[in-house]
């Protein structure tokens, strides 16, 4: 069962921030290549995003997997919706969909 404090923390994080990356490490120091790739993509697009390091809290990490029904990290959320992990973000970036999504839904990227 999901810990109540973790559920509230997750919901609050994705509600208060237009773009949130739950990742291993931080945007300044990613602790895995997959997290680093997503950070690099968001930085290339010039998007401000909130990063949450999942390495220091095992219960948060496990509860986030249940919350999102996604087994791995990083997990990118835009406007409260899970976009996906590294492979999906990379594919969306390469085909231009991620930039369009960020322009249309968050207005974080200007035309």
Swiss-Prot record:
Which positions in this protein are listed as binding glutathione? 24, 61, 73, 86-87
Record's superkingdom?
Bacteria
- Which keywords label this protein? 2Fe-2S, Iron, Iron-sulfur, Metal-binding, Redox-active center
Pfam families on file? Glutaredoxin
Q: Kindly list the positions annotated as binding [2Fe-2S] cluster.
A: 32
TM annotation in the entry:
none
GO terms (molecular function) for this protein are: 2 iron, 2 sulfur cluster binding; disulfide oxidoreductase activity; metal ion binding
Q: Where is the Glutaredoxin domain?
A: 7-109
Family, according to the entry, reads as follows: Belongs to the glutaredoxin family. Monothiol subfamily.
Q: What is this protein called?
A: Probable monothiol glutaredoxin 2
- Species, as recorded: Rickettsia typhi (strain ATCC VR-144 / Wilmington)
Gene giving rise to this polypeptide: grxC2
């Amino acid at each position: 069962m999901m810990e109540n404090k973790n559920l509230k923390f997750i919901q609050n994080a994705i509600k208060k921030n237009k773009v949130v990356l739950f990742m291993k490490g931080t945007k300044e120091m990613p602790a895995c290549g997959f997290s680093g790739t997503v950070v690099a993509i968001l930085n290339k697009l010039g998007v401000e995003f909130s990063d949450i390091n999942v390495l220091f809290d095992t219960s948060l990490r496990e509860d986030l997997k249940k919350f999102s029904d996604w087994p791995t990290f990083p997990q990118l959320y835009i406007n409260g919706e899970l976009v996906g992990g590294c492979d999906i973000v990379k594919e969306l970036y390469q085909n231009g969909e991620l930039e369009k999504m960020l322009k249309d839904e968050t207005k974080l990227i200007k035309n």
